[in-house]
Amino acid sequence: MYSHNWYLELILKDLKKLGYNITFECLNAVDYGVPQNRERLIVVGHKNNFSFPRKEIKRVCVEEAIGDLMYTTPEDSKFLTKSQDEYIAKYEKASCCKVPRDLHPDRPARTLTCRNLAGATSDMQRVKLKDGRRRRLLHKEAARLQSFPDWFEFSGNETEKFNQIGNAVPPLLAYKVAIAIKESYYDLCTQNTNHHYSEQLTLLEAI
């Protein structure tokens, strides 16, 4: 069901030893308002009943997230060379790729990773411009597709920034899960007047 099952089993075993009930599920960020297909296993240890947030009916597409950016060519744009375009064409033909791996404005993006943001030509996240040229994603575009707000600042050089974006759990997905945890904890606190729970509840007030 999951890769690295041994690691999941270890986490579950240790959480159970600490007295937690365990709920885990593979969530796709696209079901929670993130304009990207991104499956991640989320494990929650709790002392009360817990349910993951309900999936949202409407999915956000690429154009809704970066429509104002994806056909622009800022000074720091990095365009694919002729040899890269030729390599991609051969790669997609050899791998029987029916749909080019460019970003499609009318659908969610495929999973963003460190590798396809900053590295491999064949798997590169890229935008096809109206004049036929293709360029790599900008940091701002990649961040939006991960649901980061425009004001969020990443540190380091270009590769380091892409690594931070590619490795991240989408903030919007994390927020939706945090809200569900908060609701579960509120229910627990109403059932238990223990001072320990009241103190911990203050940590959730900012959510």
What are these regions (language model features)?
Residues 13-26, 36-207:
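S-adenosyl-L-methionine-dependent DNA methyltransferase catalytic core
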